[in-house]
Amino acid sequence: MRRLFVPSLAVALCCSVAYAAPAAGKAPLQHVTIFGDSVAAAFTWDPRARTVLTEGNRVTFDLSPCGRLTEPGCITPPPPSVFKKVELLGRRVGPTVVVLVGYNDDPHIYRAGIDKVLRAMQRRGVEHVLWLTLRAVNKQYLLINQVIHGASARWRGLMTVLDWNSFSRGHAGWFASDGIHLSALGGVQLAIYVHRTLKRMGLNGPVPPPA
């Protein structure tokens, strides 16, 4: 099988960075872990995007240039996959997870691995997974989007698809020349899209008291 591959821009990032610790005496904020590759890098290098996402949430950014879903990344040394990071983090993964990964993946391997990743998250206490579609600038990314939508039908109650591909359509100014990586404006718009969804789903603000 011929592997399809489109390289991502390498962006120097720390593997796991947490923001928005609660003030003393206040109820802790709901914890969100964001897994992404260099496309999601705007969440760390653009303070405006970071401010949007951390409003009302404790956010752990786990972003790796050239990152992949279940295979080591495409640079040397290769960053660990999302699956490997979930295994390493264990219960330190937040109960809410956001995933924006796939630009460096083969669609067939992505299809074989997505259920494995979701099972690993569920075993570690994850209750909600918000999975973003890719900008479908080629057939590879269109196929991965089909995999994402297919998985959501199998994982109702755990996985919610955020259709970034549709939401961003017609907004060329949100992207670099490759149509994938984000401009400063695009990073803010992606952050707003994710944050708005978290609020709508009740996954923003202080941790709710036990029922």
Model-inferred region functions:
Residues A18-G25:
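Boundary at the C-terminal end of the N-terminal hydrophobic targeting segment
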Residues Y19, L53-E55, G125, W155:
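Short, structurally constrained coil/turn elements
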Residues P209-A211:
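Short, solvent-exposed mixed-charge patches
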Residues A27-G113, Q140-L143:
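Conserved SGNH/GDSL esterase-like catalytic core that processes O-acyl groups on lipids
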Residues P77-V207:
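Alpha-helical cap/lid subdomain in secreted, periplasmic
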Residues P7-A18:
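Bacterial N-terminal signal peptides
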Residues M1-L4:
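Positively charged n-region of N-terminal signal peptides that target proteins for export
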